[in-house]
């Protein structure tokens, strides 16, 4: 049973990161294709940056899981530092996007990017010093920072509706939960925990899309994204409902045959 749980968790991560690569790639392609119909260039650049960060995170983690499964050891600490630094900058672009239309000094945006830079520095310092990457201190700092930024968006973005502020804050809180999990023991968790903890980058991208491209652009993206997600959920459901029980049955049957022969 434990082995099947680990297989399910591994499958969740592989599917999740593959879907993440596809969705962020789709975001980048659609921004470039529909750039003349969207908002000003600064917003396009922000969404392209989001897509680039999401691709770095998901590609890095996908490669890491494949490397651990098919080869000896993990990935280079420098590659891990790049991957986790990209994840750490995603909350910053969320805050940036949330304050893009506000007048005045965007102190929360500056604070978010400062925190992301600090976390990235800690990841690369850990890699250079030969310590474990990601840096637990960096992830813990970003957990606290994400909660503080979510509170700041709720309190200080006075011009935005409560619905918008709640969506921004919820995306940041999902990231906070993910960072808190990643800063602790990451081995032997259930597939549900792995789903919540490792796939926090997807709600961040969907939040930015929903807020900035609510109409045709978001609808076009969501039609493709939902089809891809449903296909992935179907594959995972078939594994849990069909493949895993069959594998467990065959393992038990083989052990019984071996015992009878002995």
Regions found by a protein language model. Name each.
Residues 32-47, 99-108, 155-167, 215-222:
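Membrane-interface helix-boundary motifs at transmembrane edges
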Residues 7-26, 39-151, 171-172, 191-202:
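Individual alpha-helical transmembrane segments in multi-pass integral membrane proteins
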Residues 25-32, 61, 150-157, 205-213, ...:
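Alpha-helical transmembrane segments
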Residues 160-262:
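Interfacial "cap-and-anchor" motif at the non-cytosolic start of specific transmembrane alpha-helices
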Residues 2, 33-35, 60-72, 122-133, ...:
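Juxtamembrane "helix-exit" motif on the non-cytosolic side of transmembrane helices
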Residues 2-10, 220:
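Short, Lys/Arg-rich N-terminal segment immediately upstream of the first membrane anchor
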Residues 1-2, 204:
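Membrane-helix interface segments in multi-pass membrane proteins
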